[in-house]
A protein has these predicted regions:
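Structural helix-boundary/capping segments
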Residues: 1-8, 15, 19-28, 92, ...
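Short helix-loop capping/hinge segments that flank enzyme active sites or metal/cofactor-binding pockets
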Residues: 1-2, 54-108, 162-175
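Acyltransferase
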Residues: 12-36, 68-73, 97-118, 146
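Short connector loops at secondary-structure junctions
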Residues: 30-52, 86-87
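Short, surface-exposed loop/helix-turn segments at secondary-structure junctions
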Residues: 53, 130-150
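Small-aliphatic-rich amphipathic alpha-helix that forms the alpha element of a beta-alpha
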Residues: 113, 143-166
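Short glycine-/small-residue-rich Rossmann-like dinucleotide-binding loops
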Residues: 126
């Protein structure tokens, strides 16, 4: 079980549903290894604890020339969110970019080491049910993540790991997914783990 940086912001009902789901895995003979049980898992958790910053820095830097061109050509057709992201990226240096590439590589090395311990990883796909969005009624205070918080997606992004999201939870009558994550370039095996999960584990609902 990989907590990622997202676990701390998961609501209690979603945590309850997920823990009940993990219990089903254990009842089916699957050993769930947590960070408190393994130094390898703890090392991986530490390496992905700022995965969002790493991912956003890398993609922001790599895209900022294209975004700058769009803003220069059609400033009124580009969202304020993109302009804000562009400003952050343009404040970076090549050294900042290189540092984040190195941090990404450290995370990938830690992920590879975990393969000696576990066949795959499981985590949530989001911190809870979809949020209510006011469509940015207040233009001076933009909602940071109008389509939901991607905290649980950053880790797999920087790891370059195959993952399958399955809607196995229902919280407050809204769907919440889990992710089955494999090692890099082991897409087929990750898919097989997800298939087994879907066929052998019952969905959990918490109202």
């Amino acid at each position: 079980f990989l907590e990622t940086e997202g676990w701390d912001i998961v609501d209690n009902k979603t945590k309850e549903a997920f823990r009940r789901l993990l219990s089903q895995f254990e009842n089916n003979g699957v050993t769930i290894v947590k960070r408190s049980m393994s130094e390898l898992v703890e090392q991986l958790e530490q390496k992905v604890s700022h995965a969002g910053d790493i991912a956003n820095s890398i993609t922001g830097w790599e895209n900022h020339w294209t975004y700058r061109n769009l803003v220069n050509k059609s400033p009124n057709k580009v969202s304020q969110r993109l302009k804000d992201s562009l400003a952050i990226a343009e404040a970076m240096t090549p050294e900042d970019y290189s540092k984040n590439l190195l941090l990404r590589e450290y995370a990938r090395e830690a992920h590879k080491r975990v393969s000696t311990l576990a066949d795959g990883m499981i985590t949530l796909s989001c911190p809870g049910p979809a949020p209510i969005w006011n469509a940015d009624d207040n233009k001076s205070h933009l909602v940071k993540r109008p389509t939901g918080d991607p905290a649980f997606n950053f880790a797999t992004s920087i790891l370059g790991a195959p993952c399958v999201t399955i809607p196995m939870l229902s919280v407050g009558n809204l769907p919440v997914g889990i992710q089955i994550v494999g090692q890099r370039e082991q897409d087929y095996f990750a898919t097989q783990l997800a298939k087994w999960t879907y066929e052998n584990i019952s969905p959990v609902s918490v109202t």
